Amino acid sequence: MPTAAIDGIATKYEVIGSGPPILMYAPGGFDATADKWRTQGVYAKIKLLDYLPQHYTCVVFDRRECGASGGRVERIGWQHYVAHGKALLDHLGFEKAHIMGGCMGCCPTAAWGVMHPDRVLSMVLYWPVGGAKYRMSSHQRFAEHLAFVQQNGAKLGLQAVVDLVTKEGKSFGADPRGGPWASVLKHDAAFAAAYVAQDVERYKQLVVGLGRTLVDRDTAPGAEPEDMLRCDIPAFIVPGNDAAHATSAARYLHECLPRSEYWDVPVADQTEANTPARLLDFLAKADASAASRGG
């Protein structure tokens, strides 16, 4: 996978196939790497990257702060993930694209629709995260990281984070103690040195705010309902059904997005035999709609 400086952040990405572009925000929560489209859970089963590239240019990437991509210590919101993806499309020369998200990737996908509707051909939201259990577990994740920093003291707390990540090599999703920048700390020594040099109290305040505002509701985060209700972009929603991907979160998005289609198929019946074809049908209709509108 090539690397480019995208929005000032070193970004690993890959372009697969040909046709209209699809920017694909990977599943995997806080470990959203391009390979998850092939290796994780339902995505390994439905094999979208065996089918979509036959008709579309699929842009897959390690999201900022994930995998081999870099990051920046700041109070990250969904708008930052949108800016990262937008800069990647700009780098590749794509003016408009379908935006697809899996899992937590649905949040910036929904945000795209309200922030840059003129650049979005359609939105695909596969297993959107959300629900009361998701909010609770997400806040617990940030709390565990903050507790680890606190337990190691003001002088050693951030160094302890770097030491842990260097030794264990786990992402924030795998071990909350390593925090939201664990993946970058693992492979970027200069970033790690700057991370340790921060004021630890200011850092803790930043993390508290990040966790509270990133996952701020008991349904699908990413965009405000009032903004989505005014969104005139075709959307395709596929529900999950577990503690991180409550079916209610998918239903909420369907309620809020006026031009959305809700594929009411149980998780067990989402297979390679039916899912890629259904998704390609939706994308073809969205392309036809955009063409008729002169998009």
Residue ranges and their predicted role:
Residues 180-223:
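Hydrophobic, aromatic-rich cap/lid helix
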